[in-house]
Amino acid sequence: MRSLIAAVERIDPLTIYGRVAAVNGLLIEVRGGLTRLAVGARVEIERFGQKPLPAEVVGFRETRALLMPFGPVEGVGPGAEIRIVPEGAVVRPTKAWLGRIINAFGEPIDGLGPLPQGEVPYPLKTPPPPAHARGRVGERLDLGVRSMNVFTTTCRGQRLGIFAGSGVGKSVLLSMLAKEATCDAVVVGLIGERGREVREFVEETLGEEGLRRAVVVVATSDEPALTRRQAAYMTLAISEFMRDQDQEVLCLMDSVTRFAMAQREIGLAAGEPPTTKGYTPTVFTELPKLLERAGPGPIRPDGTTAAPITALFTVLVDGDDHNEPIADATRGILDGHIVMERAIAERGRFPAINVLKSISRTMPGCQHPHERDIVKGARQVMSAYSNMEELIRIGAYRAGADPVVDRAIRLNPAIEAFLSQDKEEATSLDDSFGMLGQILQSEY
């Protein structure tokens, strides 16, 4: 009964109409009703013989509003009525959403029945907490992945980027984190994924164990740009709800690049000028607004701090170019980056992380002194081997010429084995440092 009363109270007695004036490509031009329309407003467009088409106001041109639809425009004709959605873009999540798969509109797509709706609406687009009103990063987080636990030790509330080309194991790494990281809830956003890979990721890669404490938000590559962008906002909105329930949240998004591509498509359709590699100015405006929503929780009025949102965002580097515009912009916003390389994947070592190029900006503050010594020693050994690798492979290096290189050659097989990890295997933080410490103290 309470939910029914709340639904009735949300009904806006004032309904504003406009009418479709023209349809040009991705845009629908509307006349009338402009006194209540603003950029970002949600509307519904009547279609002949079909359900109303949801759309969003993306701009204005003289006396007409420019709408972009969330679906195909078939059935939309001149004079079709436009109705403003008074509540705007909100979602009403509950903790019962854990274990469910939803689309960008918060609707279930897993065939398990309707989702219960919460009483509190969460706007899909909210500003990040002010810098002076949010806590600091917390204690370190056990991710269950040896290479990340040691070389990119992560604190609760930290935001990391996973930078990789296509087909090097990003999705498998995300599934390992979703299953093994020590947190209360996981929110996974699959933005612009291939349709056939979604079920494979959920059933095989993530599995029943990983899904049990997760909410998965899906927008496939064939869906409109607005829908793909909204899926990213939905992922953060659900993460913020879980945070407000005092749940320590791990937010995983694959990928930020496809969010940026969706925003570029929207901007170009609205008439924005293209800049670097065709990306519009709003892409670089929206990126920090999205990424900064994750992190340490805001400070409450009573002085306590809300639970953190630890986030890992994948960045699909174009042509394995780690300095392309989105990768470069994202790297400057986040608190660290994990670099995955195709060459490492091609030689069969997974996760294919190049630990020498990966950085966590909360290190070394979240490591004990003896752990810092282990990481420093391992980096020195791996760097020495990397610098001489070509000479070693062609047989040009003579044993005994450099004791440091000789030791690196002896230890390299064991270090490579340490960095390699099966997707069903988990290793704790303490065990990760202990294993690497034993390798450095031994001789092979």
Curated annotation (Swiss-Prot):
SUPFAM superfamilies: P-loop containing nucleoside triphosphate hydrolases. Keywords: ATP synthesis, ATP-binding, Bacterial flagellum biogenesis, Bacterial flagellum protein export, Cytoplasm, Hydrogen ion transport, Ion transport, Nucleotide-binding, Protein transport, Translocase, Transport. It comes from the Bacteria. It is found in: Cytoplasm. GO terms for cellular component: bacterial-type flagellum; cytoplasm; type III protein secretion system complex. It is an enzyme of class 7 (translocase). Pfam families: ATP-synt_ab, ATP-synt_ab_N, T3SS_ATPase_C. GO terms for molecular function: ATP binding; ATP hydrolysis activity; proton-transporting ATP synthase activity, rotational mechanism. Its EC number is 7.1.2.2. Its main location: cytoplasm. It catalyses: ATP + H2O + 4 H(+)(in) = ADP + phosphate + 5 H(+)(out). One of its GO terms (biological process) is protein secretion by the type III secretion system. ATP binds at residues 164-171. InterPro entries: AAA+_ATPase, ATPase_a/bsu_AS, ATPase_alpha/beta_chains, ATPase_F1/V1/A1_a/bsu_N, ATPase_F1/V1/A1_a/bsu_nucl-bd, ATPase_T3SS_FliI/YscN, FliI_clade3, P-loop_NTPase. PANTHER family: ATP SYNTHASE, SPI-1 TYPE 3 SECRETION SYSTEM ATPASE. Belongs to the ATPase alpha/beta chains family. Probable catalytic subunit of a protein translocase for flagellum-specific export, or a proton translocase involved in local circuits at the flagellum. This is Flagellum-specific ATP synthase.
